[in-house]
Amino acid sequence: LINGILCHGLDFDDTHSAGVIHATTSTFPCALATAGHVNASGKDMLIAYIIGVEAAARLGMVVKGGLHQIGFHPTGVMGSFGCSLVAGRLLGLNEEQLTMAQGIVLSMAAGSLEFLEDGAWTKRMHPGWAAVSGITAAFLAKEGYVGASRPYEGRFGLFNAYLSHPEYNAASDLSLATAGLRETWEIENVAIKPFPACHFTHGCID
């Protein structure tokens, strides 16, 4: 929680532009905490982190910024799903358990953009809570807790519930979540900020 808040609070977090998401701010703290708990190797921690970034970035690409338009922060929402896979990998979950972890975190993924209206500090919390949510979901799944089996495409899954507005739902392309999988690594498309501010402002700053 604290590492995620710190990463995002400093506003120097890296950005996956196509997914409009700061994936590292949630997935790396999640990987660090879970790896420490299970005494994982550095290699296993990095593999889990990469899996989380890939998942969160690709989910962000599906909605093409649509979450922003309806008031949700993709870093918090998509980061939660990425973190459930990070923790799940490090906990050794099988395929069914990983599905359950994602189905559980569906009920935890959040991040309101209302902070933009009055400068509230809650934005900084989003990646930290995403990490906590992912870890919690993975541990619950490991113990047999049952989550939604269709967390993304279900009737009330992520894309139908969060993007219920026809304009944004129609613009979503689920195929982008798996396009080029194992061939195209979205982590290679993560940009490093030259300035500690929202990347949309960098052109003006420069």
Model-derived features: positions:
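Hydrophobic alpha-helical hairpins/lids featuring a short glycine-rich hinge
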Residues: 7-61
